[in-house]
Amino acid sequence: MTIRYPNGRPFQPAKASSTHKREKIDYSNRGMTLESDINETNSYYLTHGRAVIHKKPTPVQIVNVDYPKRSAAVIKEAYFKQPSTTDYNGVYRGKYLDFEAKETRNKTSFPIQNFHEHQMEHMKKVLAQDGICFVIVRFTTFDETYLLDASHVIKAFETKETKRKSIPKSYIDSYGHLIKIGYHPRVDYLHVVDQVYFS
């Protein structure tokens, strides 16, 4: 017996699909969750008069632009003018503050390859001028965010050829400082900065 719809067409059951489509993994926004949390936190700090900290823009030289419409421009070719230093800088309690923010899905360590030579040189110069310099590291698997002084990262970077190519999570647990995640501010890293650099 054929089952029919009210319009007379026969019912056709949906075919069971045996092929499972894998979702494409998008790596384009790695680090953007931490970055957006820090941007939101910095906005909170600025609004409440706690600190003036901003994300540094990456210097880009635009070479080729296409104008498909009058109101829209599409950048077709661009180059970095110079290597960028760290992600954020500003002033807090009369001291210069400079830091990098990085995220990893790795469960046991933080890869040193996420840093570049010019960033290490910049961090050394900030520390030499008695500035506050650190790295905020988020282990996304554990939803844990740490503040780690730049001196530890520089030391690990300088020994990466002879020793490890990563900083073990156990090292970050010992020498880093866990940052409490909340609502406002989202990533209250200044609370940790107070404890580490002003106590």
From Swiss-Prot:
Where does the source fall among the domains of life? Answer: Bacteria
Molecular-function GO terms, alphabetical:
endonuclease activity; magnesium ion binding; nucleic acid binding
Record GO biological process: chromosome segregation; DNA recombination; DNA repair
Q: Is Cytoplasm tagged as a keyword?
A: yes
Q: Which gene encodes it?
A: recU
What name goes with this protein?
Holliday junction resolvase RecU
Q: Where is this site: Transition state stabilizer?
A: K102
Q: Which organism is it from?
A: Halalkalibacterium halodurans (strain ATCC BAA-125 / DSM 18197 / FERM 7344 / JCM 9153 / C-125) (Bacillus halodurans)
Q: What is its EC number?
A: 3.1.21.10
Where does it reside?
Cytoplasm
Q: Where is this region: Disordered?
A: 1-24
Its biological purpose is as follows: Endonuclease that resolves Holliday junction intermediates in genetic recombination. Cleaves mobile four-strand junctions by introducing symmetrical nicks in paired strands. Promotes annealing of linear ssDNA with homologous dsDNA. Required for DNA repair, homologous recombination and chromosome segregation.
The cofactors named for this UniProt entry are: Mg(2+)
What binding details are noted for the cofactor? Binds 1 Mg(2+) ion per subunit.
Q: Which residues bind Mg(2+)?
A: T85, D87, E100, Q119
The reaction(s) catalysed by this protein are: Endonucleolytic cleavage at a junction such as a reciprocal single-stranded crossover between two homologous DNA duplexes (Holliday junction)
Pfam family membership, one: RecU
Q: Extract the HAMAP family matched here.
A: RecU (MF_00130)
